């Protein structure tokens, strides 16, 4: 369903003004109205936010687990996928899961770090895990999670982290694939999130 939407993108933040347009998304049988947010004058995207939505988190975790390949550990890049990562670990009975941080943290016993250059922006993305966690995933099958796959940059950086730590990428999963990302044949997702025109219609 479309409503009148006003949304602005500044840096890494979306600024939304009421009234706003939404897009009704069916996520493996559960429906949510996603606000449409402006990225450029001719491009709007649907804002899928799993934070704070317990029903959505539990539902998506269960549906992804039904489709998941065999794995030993779950790993996700921070931060939007954290609720999903936790809930999938909880539902599967896992004792632990791993989070790739954007920088070193004081609690880490040591730092295992990778730097991956972005294909689209040429910037360098840093991902970090504790060296103790890196040791645990060595030789193990690691299932990589994210909330939405769009450019795939976060996914590629996380894959490189797993490989450099000596782990095996068991699979790549997300709730949604945005835009052309749905054409990737090496990902498992629950649905396709289209891109939008300024009037709220789906881009061809």
Language-model segment annotations:
Residues 16-71:
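Active-site-facing substrate-recognition patch
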Residues 19-24, 156-204:
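PRPP-dependent phosphoribosyltransferase catalytic core
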Residues 72, 140, 170:
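Conserved acidic residues
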Residues 78-84, 151:
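Gly/Ser/Thr-rich loops at beta-strand to alpha-helix junctions
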Residues 84-92, 159:
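Short Gly/Thr/Asp-enriched flexible loops that form oxyanion-binding sites at enzyme active sites
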Residues 95-142:
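Short, glycine/charge-rich flexible loops or terminal/linker lids adjacent to PRPP-binding catalytic cores
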């Amino acid at each position: 369903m479309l409503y009148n939407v006003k949304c602005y993108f500044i840096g890494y933040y979306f600024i939304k003004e009421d009234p706003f347009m939404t897009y009704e998304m069916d996520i493996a049988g559960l429906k949510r109205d996603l606000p449409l947010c402006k990225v450029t004058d001719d491009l709007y995207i649907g804002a899928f936010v799993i934070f704070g939505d317990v029903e959505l988190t539990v539902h998506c975790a269960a549906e992804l687990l039904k489709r998941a390949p065999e794995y030993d550990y779950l790993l996700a890049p921070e931060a939007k996928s954290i609720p999903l990562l936790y809930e999938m670990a909880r539902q599967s009975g896992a004792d632990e899961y791993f989070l790739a941080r954007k920088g070193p943290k004081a609690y880490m016993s040591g730092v295992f770090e990778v730097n991956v250059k972005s294909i689209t922006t040429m910037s360098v993305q840093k991902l970090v895990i504790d060296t103790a966690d890196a040791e645990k995933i060595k030789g193990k099958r690691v299932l990589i999670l994210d909330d939405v796959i769009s450019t795939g940059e976060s996914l590629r950086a996380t894959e490189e982290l797993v490989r450099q730590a000596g782990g095996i990428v068991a699979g790549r999963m997300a709730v949604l694939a945005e835009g052309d990302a749905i054409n990737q044949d090496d990902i498992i997702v629950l649905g396709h999130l289209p891109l939008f025109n300024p009037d709220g219609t789906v881009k061809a």
